[in-house]
Amino acid sequence: MAWKFTSDRPVYLQIAERITKSVLSGEYKPGEQIPSVRQLALEAAVNPNTVQRAFSELENNGLIISKNTIGRFVTDDTEILESCRNALAKKLVKEFMQNMNHLSITIEQAIKIIEEEKL
């Protein structure tokens, strides 16, 4: 089934974010090989060049590493993984707070809502 993309951001960034979330959630473990460009392109129903660009972005961030002709692997560097996790958490919190501000909800009110909705 093809992945769903939005028109507000480049597709390669959405693919990179999805892979990042898969890594940080543990779907792909540190040191584990990730699917190939062709596999992900078929799964996402996009051009392989788009997936390649997403992979380049992730390699630049240090989240994945390329091992010659063997393939691409999740880094096993815990500092990089933790840094990526913190960066993503900050981004999500910023987006959340922007949405709360649009609703005229204060930080205190947002915290109260979060505490009430703990999973």
Task: Describe the residue ranges of each PLM region.
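A short alpha-helical element within helix-turn-helix/winged-helix DNA-binding domains
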Residues: Q33-A44, L58
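Short, charged/polar, Gly/Pro-enriched secondary-structure boundary elements
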Residues: I80-R85
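Short Asp/Glu-rich motifs
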Residues: A41-L42, D77-T78, L119
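Extreme N-terminal segment that seeds HTH/winged-HTH DNA-binding domains in transcriptional regulators
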Residues: M1-Q33, Q39, A87-L119
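Short, Lys/Arg-rich nucleic-acid/phosphate-binding segment
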Residues: I34, S66-V74, E79
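Short, charge-rich, low-complexity alpha-helical interaction segments
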Residues: S56-I64
